A protein has these predicted regions:
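Hydrophobic, small-residue-rich alpha-helical packing segments that form membrane-like cores
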Residues: 1-35
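Active-site neighborhoods of metal-dependent hydrolases
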Residues: 30-34, 39-191
């Protein structure tokens, strides 16, 4: 609060996904904002809340009504990227996320995980493999409404995953300038 800058907060699990969590992630953010006076900015509000976004946003709205400065960010799509070894992608935890192994695609190969056996194999042999996890189906009207709700929340901003670029030819991301052929960026950030 003294620095007058927001915290960029990655919340813990919500109670709907993990009833054993010591405190619901959205409630913890609400309390921290109220107790410290800090501007709390919740990262990836829709991917951490998934189909429980309405309840989470109501909790954050309560914080705002209590005088706290709370903002959020969301991706404009129903997927996120991480490493296949992430704790929440353990086969026994997928139900809490309302996903199955087929919601996970490996990068850069494009392989969609066929089943739990394959998921366990990749997690054991190559836990750092990047993947895309689809948790909201943008073609499903209910999931699309959930996504839009998170983007339309007051003081919400559009975010991205900040993952490395995976080129189709297998080459690695570089800081080379100008951008390599096939790369693109927004004109405001082009230099």
């Amino acid at each position: 609060a003294e620095a007058r800058v927001p915290t960029f907060t990655h919340t813990r699990e919500i109670v709907e996904s993990n009833p054993d969590t010591p405190i619901d992630g959205a409630e913890e953010l609400r309390r921290a904002a109220g107790e410290t006076g800090a501007h709390m900015h919740q990262c990836h509000v829709h991917s951490t809340s998934r189909r429980h976004i309405e309840r989470v946003l109501q909790t954050l709205a309560l914080a705002r009504a209590e005088g706290s400065k709370v903002t959020v960010e969301a991706y404009p799509y129903g997927a996120g990227s991480t490493g296949i070894g992430a704790a929440f992608l353990a086969p026994e935890k997928l139900d809490a996320w309302q996903i199955t192994p087929s919601n996970i695609m490996l990068l850069p190969s494009g392989e969609v995980i066929a089943d739990t056996t394959r998921l366990k194999e990749i997690r054991e042999t190559a836990p750092g493999t990047a993947c895309i996890v689809t948790y909201l189906d943008e073609f499903d009207p209910n999931d699309k409404a959930t996504l839009i709700q998170s983007l339309a929340y007051e003081d919400s901003i559009v975010a991205s995953d900040a993952m490395p670029i995976f080129w189709l030819d297998g080459s690695n991301e570089t800081r080379e300038w100008p951008l390599p052929a096939g790369g693109s960026t927004h004109p405001r950030t082009a230099g």
